[in-house]
């Protein structure tokens, strides 16, 4: 009986982890779409993970960014980068998703 309970617990934990991995993968794919198409980040930035070869903004392959830092930069802009949040270019949800994507793809 203890083995059955143990196996059920392990199965439950594995299912939860698989669901989280699938959710993260979906978020990464949506983030890539926002980066390349919706926001057009690829036009200015270099980032191998996105196939981006821009030449205006910083090379995102050479920096290790946190999700919060990316959110702030995308929302409020920095230098010549527009304020995608304040100017209504991206929704808060889109900013959250693209920030997750960049933070998990930059510096790699």
What is each PLM-predicted segment?
Residues 25-47:
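Sequence/structural segment immediately N-terminal to covalent heme-attachment motifs in c-type
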Residues 36, 65, 75, 79, ...:
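Sec-exported extracytoplasmic/periplasmic mature domains
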Residues 87-108:
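C-terminal capping alpha-helices of c-type cytochrome domains
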């Amino acid at each position: 009986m203890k083995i059955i309970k143990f196996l059920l617990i392990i199965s439950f934990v594995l299912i939860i982890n698989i669901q989280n991995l699938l959710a993260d993968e979906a978020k990464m794919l949506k983030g890539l779409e926002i980066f390349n198409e919706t926001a057009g980040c690829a036009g200015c930035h270099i980032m191998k993970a996105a196939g981006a070869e821009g030449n205006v903004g910083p090379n995102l392959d050479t920096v290790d960014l946190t999700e919060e830092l990316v959110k702030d930069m995308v929302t409020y802009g920095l230098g010549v980068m527009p304020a995608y949040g304040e100017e209504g270019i991206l929704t808060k949800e889109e900013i959250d998703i693209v920030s997750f994507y960049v933070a998990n793809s930059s510096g790699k």
